[in-house]
Amino acid sequence: MSSRGTRSSTAAEQKRQEDVNKESNMNDSVTEWSVLEETLLLKAICRGLRPVGIEKNFYMIGILREIRDGCKRSTIKAQDVWNKLGTLYNLKEFEELEAPGNEEVKAKEKRIKSPDVKDFKLPKDILKVKEKSEKPLETSQKVEIETVETKPGEPEVKQETNLQKEKKESKVKLESKEEKISRNLRSSSRSISPVTEQPQSPKIQPVIPEKKEKSEKKESSMTLRKRSVSPSSQNTARSPKRMATEPIEPASSPAASNQAIRRSSRSRRPPT
């Protein structure tokens, strides 16, 4: 019996020594966290990467990725993250909350304590809670409405606010500015680059080949006609108009000559 008791005591002592060695090794292997690494860890937890429950290892991989993406020189490992979370939070309480079917804990609405400020390496200016000012900031603009007296016979006039008036005035100012800019541009363009009107060259109409052929044919026919008519024939030939105007000479017979003499003598006699 004594041998058995000694064996059990030695086994318990060995376990204790192993636990102490593990704790010492963990303390020795703890890496120093920078401010940037701590902020990245807190951001990952706020986004929903909580290493609790059945899928805690997968969430841990996501946390490590975010830390390494944000700080490429970081040498933090999964064990370092576990140790940091163990110092900040009570992981057993987290697991109780995230355990499926744990209705008793949900009914109690158990709340986990937030970590102490001393555990962080963040600067004091960030961790200090600023006191809220007693007077809230007046963000809303006061709109003053002008009252207009209306008589029963007159139509109702719509009440315009100061904001609407300011909008109208700004629109008018913008339009006037645009007009001034356009005028200045026109005057500058005229003074810098005056437009010189060049004489327009006469438009040359293209000659169609068919019309050319017709005109050539007409010219050739006219030249042939002129050549066919000689100058002697032109002098001898009489036009019908000239034939009509010339008087017809009477025939040279003795009877006709006697009659003409009688007529002339009668016309010379004085009247009785």
From Swiss-Prot:
The modification Phosphoserine is found at residues 193, 201. Residues 13-22, 131-182, 209-220 have a biased composition (Basic and acidic residues). Belongs to the EAF7 family. One of its GO terms (biological process) is regulation of transcription by RNA polymerase II. This is Probable chromatin modification-related protein eaf7. The lineage of its organism: Eukaryota, Fungi, Dikarya, Ascomycota, Taphrinomycotina. It is found in: Nucleus. Keywords: Chromatin regulator, DNA damage, DNA repair, Nucleus, Phosphoprotein, Transcription, Transcription regulation. Transmembrane segments: none annotated. One of its GO terms (cellular component) is nucleus. It comes from the Eukaryota. PANTHER family: MRG-BINDING PROTEIN, MRG_MORF4L-BINDING PROTEIN. Residues 263-272 have a biased composition (Basic residues). Residues 1-12, 194-203, 229-238 have a biased composition (Polar residues). The keyword Phosphoprotein applies. It holds the Pfam family Eaf7.
